[in-house]
């Protein structure tokens, strides 16, 4: 086997480089490169060579196959080192004297001086935009799972929604729909019509009208109005009966409490009259 070994000028003095050609196999003709230290130790790869030399030599630009230093990599590394050293030497002075604290807007009203070149111009403002705060989509779902209790700490039974009301959106239950409609009745002055767009069922995250509750569009018929009127009349009648019973009970309680003091006062008046009759009249001289 033909072996050629010669001195490697890129490495320290005494290091030799050897090329061994392969005679057979799929990689026939390929040459294996080895390096030998002055003591005769053999190295088969660049990592072995770097571990052996350690910090005595920089092998970042060394080509293990050719045994030479790559000049383009050497120039780039020199430029990088020169740039880093110049930055470290010069540096930018920190002239900022502000305290390193977060600057937030003041919650207190502060005077503002208005300077303008056109005093006749008027500033237009829309107070409605400042009042209406943006809301999350499907924020009504946060109200689901909440229950109401009366003064006796008993659970209040939730009302049943009409059959014509159907929810819209992912995971919209009857409880969520009831909370959404109740919130719309208390927080909005607009008429409740539901989601009028038909595309909201395909992609509610895009076509949802945030001004309306999470329900499909519905129509209020005369039959619905009649049923609601009957329900209101029944509730009013029950309320009237309850108020009347409470008033009668209150009157009876006052009557029972007023009998004893009244009898006692009458008895005291009779005793005073008897004492006045028993007193003798003074004799006349």
Swiss-Prot record:
Q: Subcellular location, in the record's words? A: Nucleus; Chromosome
Coiled-coil blocks: 221-279
Looking up PROSITE patterns in the UniProt record yields: MBD (PS50982)
Look up keyword DNA-binding and say if it applies. yes
Name its GO BP terms in alphabetical order: chromatin remodeling; embryonic organ development; epigenetic regulation of gene expression; in utero embryonic development; negative regulation of DNA-templated transcription; positive regulation of DNA-templated transcription; regulation of cell fate specification; regulation of stem cell differentiation
Keywords in alphabetical order? Chromosome, Coiled coil, DNA-binding, Isopeptide bond, Nucleus, Phosphoprotein, Transcription, Transcription regulation, Ubl conjugation
> Could you tell me which residues belong to the region Disordered?
255-285
Q: Which SUPFAM superfamilies match?
A: DNA-binding domain
Pfam families, per database record: MBD, MBD_C, MBDa
Q: What does this protein do?
A: Acts as a component of the histone deacetylase NuRD complex which participates in the remodeling of chromatin. Acts as transcriptional repressor and plays a role in gene silencing. Does not bind methylated DNA by itself. Binds to a lesser degree DNA containing unmethylated CpG dinucleotides. Recruits histone deacetylases and DNA methyltransferases.
The protein's name in its UniProt record: Methyl-CpG-binding domain protein 3
- Which species does the entry assign this protein to? Mus musculus (Mouse)
The UniProt gene name for this protein comes to Mbd3
